[in-house]
Curated annotation (Swiss-Prot):
Role: Required for the insertion and/or proper folding and/or complex formation of integral membrane proteins into the membrane. Involved in integration of membrane proteins that insert both dependently and independently of the Sec translocase complex, as well as at least some lipoproteins. Aids folding of multispanning membrane proteins.
Name of the molecule in the record: Membrane protein insertase YidC
Gene responsible for this protein: yidC
Keyword Membrane: yes
Assembly behavior: Interacts with the Sec translocase complex via SecD. Specifically interacts with transmembrane segments of nascent integral membrane proteins during membrane integration.
Subcellular location: Cell inner membrane
Keywords noted in UniProt: Cell inner membrane, Cell membrane, Chaperone, Membrane, Protein transport, Transmembrane, Transmembrane helix, Transport
Extent of Polar residues compositional bias: 84-94
Record's compositionally biased regions (Acidic residues): 58-78
Biological source species: Rhodopirellula baltica (strain DSM 10527 / NCIMB 13988 / SH1)
GO MF term set: membrane insertase activity
Length: 827
């Protein structure tokens, strides 16, 4: 019967875990954040409460366009000379000796950010943050046109320190250059980007590769060593690879445009003032000086005419320092007209943030699961840290009765509500946010902030909604800019990991959120970091599990002794059950009285279960939040389970598995076969087989079958959990098996209870003040006439209330004699 008790506790643990999981998932859906009420995204001009930003207005430098250009600045569109084709520029480097931790790629078409790669290295020289879903080699980002050409693939940019830049060829100085045409890779002919990607899939980091290019009509064979793929924290949606989601649109990040001229401004859901050209589609003049890249764009009178304005100029500068996760940005709008103009600009936020693991990850947020893979976070003096779910933005965009954009603060908001500390896009392990310039605590010169999506809401599949491309924008204060003057603003763009020390240094500490179980998750994370000094986080999880289970050993032994005591009580409990088989209340009370008399607490054996549940949840939260566990490998010599914060991904079956099971976001199992969850389920079943006694009746057999089925169902839910969590379960299960075998040998051989006491307690009618009461008197189960007492009878006896005489039923009442005619009595 000890095994029977263990069986019941194991069944209770599985049942409670499943119930907790199902209730938790239901609450996540039930309490998903409601859509905020529609706000006026555009305030009336007469009702503006934001003072003109006169302190940001400055005279335009004489060296800048617009100063002294006279009539040239007011010429029509046809006279404005612009480059015929875009150019790409880079800041930072992938070279580990350069000191840079980022490689930024900028595009002159729109003057925005096309790509940001994190290139920081570990002490062993490997990338600290790589693409966890890519195992092939990396040549470098080339900004190549994906369409096919007759010659090959045109190289538009080569990042410093990339394998393409470090390639060598006989008699040629330097590596690949912009303008080269790639015609072959590893002796395979390639003429479009998809063919090059297919050829790259056959490579591995560290391998040597041959790249054939056409330069000045001459074929050159370059040799280079491929590297790991760095994490592209910002990228175009069309470059998402396997994570590309239908409906997400490709748009550069941090684009700058004219937000307002006079009384005309951008309407909600639009990118430009009605009738004006989108500056994101125009090619800007570009120049680079070391770590600074500048872009300039002039809009002529005719281009400004739809806004009832005159010629203006847009300028912006990007700067990057070594060992910094922030990109400095200076933006300005110049008045190139002959009279003053009311001007304001709009700067868009980042978009295309990494989607890694969106189909299996569980991002922790205060929104009860309403969080998407990419959410908007911001902090103001009035509201503190806030999160706007990508789910809510997509649902808002699908609702035609509401504006596409969700206002975060408006021109008529109180000043503290517009005192902005940061605003950005938040992913599971990374954040990209706009910050005040260094030395300044907040931004006070923006009159409006709003969150939106860079996607076609009708084209995003329902099962991929959490991967929607979320972004935001900021509208500057309105300034009356004199001729030849400018409205300027300095900003920083943080793009980096959610490491506590890094985030605190940039004022973004609130973006790291553990939720309700932070009191467990944070200490567990600290212990894991301590144990990681052994050199492997998988081994650290094993050590953590052994430490926890070792500390719980006294409780486990006590639970085993409790099960042994339950075995001694089992015959008497069975007698009580048979005696009161028709009276559930009497049976439960008699069993409780027996347990109290002998000093037995049936809940004492549940302590290990209740202690393990918070540890399980805390470890799950740690794996979902702590970036140190991202990319932590099971072993350095294998690519299997190379990310303990993700499924182990032993085998890719997405090419042939039914999409309902193996699809990204659409399947129950995902595109990879994972072996660790199978081992976990096998160990659970083995424990049940080893320690569950044979069924003695039909009810016990049914219970055992149900437990087996529930274990299999639990394996279905666990199929996509992080590999680190599976290692915890495997270690804990193996410990449990060994512990049961050891404890069973150390249990006392003598009985815990006196058999005479057990028989006397079971035979008695109850306990009164700790003494056995064998009478069937006032508290007995039968009345004086021998009939069983009802619950009402027993309640009245305890309360001392005499029984009231019940009114006779209608059928039992005596009818009065009828007085029909002719029925009189004779005298």
């Amino acid at each position: 019967m000890a095994d029977s008790s263990v069986e019941r506790r194991l069944f209770s643990f599985i049942l409670s875990s499943m119930a907790f999981f199902l209730i938790y998932m239901s609450l996540r859906t039930m309490f998903a954040p409601p859509l905020p009420p529609e706000e006026d995204a555009i305030a009336e001009v007469d009702g503006e409460t934001v003072e003109p930003a006169e302190d940001l207005v400055a005279d335009t430098d004489a060296s800048e366009p617009g100063e002294g250009e006279g009539e040239e600045a007011n010429e029509d569109t046809d006279a404005v000379e612009r480059p015929s084709s875009p150019t790409w520029s880079t800041l930072g480097s992938m070279d580990p000796t350069s000191g840079y931790v980022m490689l930024v790629t900028l595009n002159s078409r729109g003057g925005g950010i096309e790509r940001i790669e994190l290139t920081e290295r570990k002490e062993n020289g490997r990338l600290k943050y790589r693409r966890v879903d890519v195992r092939s080699g990396y040549l470098g980002y080339l900004a190549a046109d994906p369409t096919a050409t007759d010659l090959g693939i045109r190289v538009n940019v080569v990042g410093p320190g990339t394998p393409a830049d470090l390639a060598t060829a006989s008699g040629v100085q330097g590596g690949l250059k912009p303008g080269d045409i790639i015609t072959g890779f590893n002796q395979n002919n390639v003429n479009n980007l998809s063919m090059l990607r297919e050829a790259m899939l056959e490579t591995k980091p560290g391998e040597s590769a041959t790249v054939t290019v056409l330069r000045n009509e001459k074929s050159i064979d370059f040799t280079t060593t491929l590297t790991e793929h760095p994490l592209d924290l910002i990228r175009l949606a069309e470059h998402g690879g396997d994570d590309e989601v239908e409906g997400n649109l490709s748009r550069l990040s941090c684009l700058l445009t004219v937000g307002r001229v006079g009384r005309r401004e951008i309407q909600s859901g639009e990118k430009t003032i009605e009738g004006m050209v989108d500056t994101g589609d125009l090619i800007w003049d570009a120049s680079q000086d070391g770590d600074n890249v500048s872009y300039q764009l002039q809009l002529s009178d005719s281009e400004m005419k739809p806004a009832s304005g005159k010629s203006v100029g847009l300028q912006r500068t990007y700067s990057l320092k070594p060992d910094s996760y922030s990109l400095d940005m200076d933006v300005q709008i110049d008045n190139r007209a002959e009279e003053a103009q009311e001007l304001a600009y709009r700067i868009e936020g980042a978009n295309g943030i990494t989607l890694e693991g969106w189909w299996y990850s569980n991002k922790i947020s205060p929104n009860w699961g309403g969080s998407a893979a990419r959410d908007i976070v911001y902090k103001t003096t009035a509201e503190g840290h806030e999160l706007v779910s990508g789910y809510a933005l997509l649902k808002r965009a699908k609702n035609e009765s509401e504006a596409d954009d969700q206002t975060l603060f408006a021109p008529d908001s109180a000043p503290p509500a517009r005192n902005l500390s940061y605003i950005g896009v938040d992913a599971q392990y990374f954040t990209v946010a706009m910050l005040p310039p260094e030395g300044q605590e907040s931004l006070k010169t923006f009159r409006r902030a709003a969150a939106n999506i860079i996607a076609d809401p009708s084209a995003v599949p329902d099962n991929k909604e959490r991967a929607v491309n979320a972004s935001f924008y900021l509208d500057s204060a309105i300034a009356d800019v004199p001729p030849g003057s400018s409205l300027k603003q300095s900003l920083r763009l943080f793009a980096g990991p959610k490491q506590p020390d890094v985030m605190e240094a940039y004022g973004l500490g609130d973006c790291i959120y553990y939720g309700w179980f932070s009191f467990v998750a944070k200490p567990l994370g600290g212990l894991l970091h301590l144990f990681s000094n052994v050199g492997n986080y998988a081994l650290a999880i094993v050590l953590l599990t052994l430490c926890v289970r070792g500390l719980m050993f006294p409780l486990s032994r006590k639970a085993a002794i409790n099960a042994q005591r339950m075995q001694e009580l089992a015959p008497e409990l069975k007698k009580i059950a048979e005696k009161h088989k028709d009276d559930m209340e009497a049976r439960v009370r008699a069993q409780r009285e027996l347990q109290q008399r002998v000093g037995f607490n049936p809940m004492a054996g549940c302590a290990p279960m209740f202690l393990q549940l918070p540890i399980f949840i805390g470890l799950y939260r740690t794996l979902s939040v702590d970036i140190e566990l991202r990319q932590a490998a099971f072993a350095s010599w294998t690519t299997w389970a190379s990310n303990l914060a993700a499924p182990d991904m032993m085998y890719y079956w997405g090419d042939w598995m039914w999409d309902y099971l193996g699809g990204r976001g659409t399947g129950w199992l995902g595109p990879y076969f994972n072996i660790l969850p199978m081992i976990v389920v096998s160990l659970f079943l083995a424990q049940q087989k080893m320690f569950m006694p044979p069924a003695t009746d039909e009810q016990t057999a049914m219970t055992q079958k149900m437990m087996n089925y529930m274990t299999l169902v639990m394996g279905l839910f666990f199929f996509r959990v992080p590999a680190g969590l599976c290692i915890y379960f495997i270690t804990s299960s193996l410990w449990g098996i060994g512990e049961r075998i050891l404890v069973k040998k150390t249990l006392p051989s003598k009985p815990h209870f006196d058999p005479a006491t057990l028989q006397g307690a079971a035979a008695g009618g109850g306990t009164v003040d700790g003494k056995v009461n064998n009478s069937a008197g006032a508290n007995g189960k039968k009345s004086s006439d021998g009939k069983p007492k009802t619950m009402a009878d027993r309640l009245r006896e305890r309360l001392g209330t005499p029984e009231e005489e019940a009114a006779p039923l209608p059928k039992d009442r005596k009818r009065p004699p009828s007085k029909k005619p002719g029925n009189k009595k004779r005298r």
